[in-house]
Amino acid sequence: MRIVFMGTPEFAVPSLKRLFEEGYDVLAVVTQPDKQRGRGMKVSFSPVKELALQKGVKVLQPESVKNNPEFLQELKELNPEVIVVAAYGKILPEEILTLPEYGCINVHASLLPKYRGAAPINWAIINGEKETGITTMLMDKGLDTGDMLLKRSIAIEEDDDAQTLHDKLANLGAEVLSETLKKLKEGKLIPEKQKDEEATYAPIITKEMGHIDWKSPACRIRNLIRGLKPWPGCYTFYDGKMLKIWKAEVVEHFGNEPPGSVLKSKDELIVKCGENALRILEIQQEGSRKMGIREYLIGHNIPEGTILK
């Protein structure tokens, strides 16, 4: 089967690897343009491009996929039977969606129609879901609205964060893609329409979302910490300095102190929330490294009764 693969970040790498391992004819890889990163503004390639170059596969990096006749012509000349899309990062126009014989198949990191959009992994954790999964679907003009092909679920563990769940789903995505393509070749797939009335959305994550509102229940703040790790991270302010909180656990507390109050700070750090409290386990002060809370408290004094902002 002749395939063009479209993807950009780490999430897409296991799916592309699986195509190579299973001997598919990967005609080309389409990925986002190179970016300049770091203080030296060095050009860095996307993880998908790195893998494609290792395998000697043609790489296409259009600035835009819409109103781009040159790119469209390149795709037509490649003549793929199917286009596989995994976290590519751009919306495809209809002339690309209808080009391959079998259409464009997307590997999406949620159990559609729940969590359509850019950040399904983060939002599943933020919202306290107990399971999520992978859906492969036939792409249409909408945002993750196409007919579903296969679904596989996975439990969200209590200690999962967005990074650990991302890695699990990236690997599961490769498995589900493999099964989808096999069944596609055998004519054994029956596309299933999504129930739009059951749809929920997973909008893009912003840095501002990480600012902790201590009036929220402790369980909700803990889910936010997990859902925004490693980027952008959750933070609060003490004495004008940002404190990033990377790990915490809920503790029962029925006092009436103001939310954000430091309840204990001798050898552990417990902060009052709108409901219950949080025991902070990993912290990072602005300009410093991440550390366990005991190590942090040896060198930093946060008096009990202090209110974190």
Curated annotation (Swiss-Prot):
Task: Name any one GO molecular function.
Answer: methionyl-tRNA formyltransferase activity
Identify the EC number(s).
2.1.2.9
- Sorted alphabetically, which SUPFAM superfamilies does this protein's record hold? FMT C-terminal domain-like, Formyltransferase
User: Which sites bind (6S)-5,6,7,8-tetrahydrofolate?
Assistant: S110, L111, L112, P113
- Note the superkingdom of the native organism: Bacteria
Q: Where are the transmembrane segments?
A: none
Under InterPro entries, the record lists: Fmt, Formyl_trans_C, Formyl_transf_N, Formyl_transf_N_sf, Formyl_transferase-like_C_sf, GART_AS, Met-tRNA-FMT_C, Met-tRNA-FMT_N
Task: Identify the keywords attached in UniProt to this record, alphabetized.
Answer: Protein biosynthesis, Transferase
- One Pfam family this sequence matches: Formyl_trans_N
Q: Does the keyword Transferase apply?
A: yes
User: Which reactions does this protein catalyse?
Assistant: L-methionyl-tRNA(fMet) + (6R)-10-formyltetrahydrofolate = N-formyl-L-methionyl-tRNA(fMet) + (6S)-5,6,7,8-tetrahydrofolate + H(+)
Q: Which GO terms describe its cellular component?
A: cytosol
What family does this belong to?
Belongs to the Fmt family.
HAMAP family registered for this protein in UniProt: Formyl_trans
Q: Tell me, what does this protein do in biology?
A: Attaches a formyl group to the free amino group of methionyl-tRNA(fMet). The formyl group appears to play a dual role in the initiator identity of N-formylmethionyl-tRNA by promoting its recognition by IF2 and preventing the misappropriation of this tRNA by the elongation apparatus.
- Name of the protein: Methionyl-tRNA formyltransferase
Organism the protein comes from: Caldanaerobacter subterraneus subsp. tengcongensis (strain DSM 15242 / JCM 11007 / NBRC 100824 / MB4)
